[in-house]
Amino acid sequence: MCFPLPSNSFKTMTDLDYMRRAIALAKQGLGWTNPNPLVGCVIVKNGEIVAEGYHEKIGGWHAERNAVLHCKEDLSGATAYVTLEPCCHHGRTPPCSDLLIERGIKKVFIGSSDPNPLVAGRGANQLRQAGVEVVEGLLKEECDALNPIFFHYIQTKRPYVLMKYAMTADGKIATGSGESKWITGESARARVQQTRHQYSAIMVGVDTVLADNPMLNSRMPNAKQPVRIVCDSQLRTPLDCQLVQTAKEYRTVIATVSDDLQKIEQFRPLGVDVLVCKARNKRVDLQDLLQKLGEMQIDSLLLEGGSSLNFSALESGIVNRVHCYIAPKLVGGKQAKTPIGGEGIQQIDQAVKLKLKSTELIGEDILLDYVVISPL
């Protein structure tokens, strides 16, 4: 859509600046577009921005359409900067490539290629065949960073998994007595609420439910609420816990291997979906669970489990990203739990290998953002 812009305010902007503006616009859709990608679009004519837009929500207009259709300017001869290759197929909305051609756009800068099999280079090729000059790969790394969830889901049909945990400077997620509220400060906890808004689902193990009785909702104002998932192999989740009692308000799923129909039927009238999965060592097979969640169009999963579930997730090879919050506190104690439990590994060369993407100071706490490059 068109936003009021000061006269001549962007006269000295470069191609890189325009694409950075498109990236900033795309980020405004965080949490609302899943399972669609984040996309921003800026249209420039005679050195000035005349239209801009972003994909605001699932089912809504795409970025290019938002920019073009809310603008009354003649766009003939203009240049478009789009963070993701324009679509060329009919989905919930008509093709964006057709619209850019119809409005006389003469040049299009594209940040990321779209791996969606329905697009996958066809959008750029259609523009070229219509005589539009296409430049691909402008700020590709930054544009790619907008959509790790979309890229993963569209190619695997499984959720992108982010493991999140908070620990003290000596690597403890709780004291020896089990107390964990609160390890991090308010600012870090507020960031977690934003992350919950951005992910389609959040998962904990039944031990976390029994110990903390969590709600697992996003407390950010006007947030989109994630699907709440409990990994509970033997259906030990109490019927009177907060997750079950609020299941009609917030979608709640229990993943289990139990075939106890009497137990299963106790949850259904309360609004809980019980998902029976394959068993692996008498526990939920997390690979099978991810397959089922993908079929439910859940494109992303925030894992806020305890040490046992965290290790199981790593052992199953489902984790794509890790957010490690470190608080400036020391608690010690041999019995105090660490973020990753389970049996662990026996040899260092078998360790899960991570790549550090960023380090951020949030209040007094540190957030380390890693991607998994070598799973177990």
Curated annotation (Swiss-Prot):
Pfam family, one: dCMP_cyt_deam_1
PROSITE patterns per record: CYT_DCMP_DEAMINASES_1, CYT_DCMP_DEAMINASES_2
Gene Ontology BP, a term: riboflavin biosynthetic process
Record: residues binding substrate: S180, R196, L216, R219, E304
Chain positions covered by the region annotation Deaminase: 1-157
SUPFAM superfamilies for the chain: Cytidine deaminase-like, Dihydrofolate reductase-like
Tagged with keyword Zinc: yes
Chain's role: Converts 2,5-diamino-6-(ribosylamino)-4(3h)-pyrimidinone 5'-phosphate into 5-amino-6-(ribosylamino)-2,4(1h,3h)-pyrimidinedione 5'-phosphate.
Protein name: Riboflavin biosynthesis protein RibD
Metabolic or biological pathway: Cofactor biosynthesis; riboflavin biosynthesis; 5-amino-6-(D-ribitylamino)uracil from GTP: step 2/4; Cofactor biosynthesis; riboflavin biosynthesis; 5-amino-6-(D-ribitylamino)uracil from GTP: step 3/4
GO molecular function, one term: 5-amino-6-(5-phosphoribosylamino)uracil reductase activity
Positions annotated to bind Zn(2+): H62, C87, C96
Domain of life where this protein originates: Bacteria
NCBIfam families membership: eubact_ribD, ribD_Cterm
Coiled coil: none
Assigned keywords, A-Z: Hydrolase, Metal-binding, Multifunctional enzyme, NADP, Oxidoreductase, Riboflavin biosynthesis, Zinc
Stretches the record annotates as Reductase: 158-376
Active-site residues per Swiss-Prot or TrEMBL entry: E64
Residues annotated as binding NADP(+): A166, W182, T208, D212, S233, G306, S307, S308, L309, N310, F311, S312
Manner of cofactor binding, per the entry note: Binds 1 zinc ion.
Family, similarity comment: In the N-terminal section; belongs to the cytidine and deoxycytidylate deaminase family. In the C-terminal section; belongs to the HTP reductase family.
Stretches assigned to the CMP/dCMP-type deaminase domain: 13-135
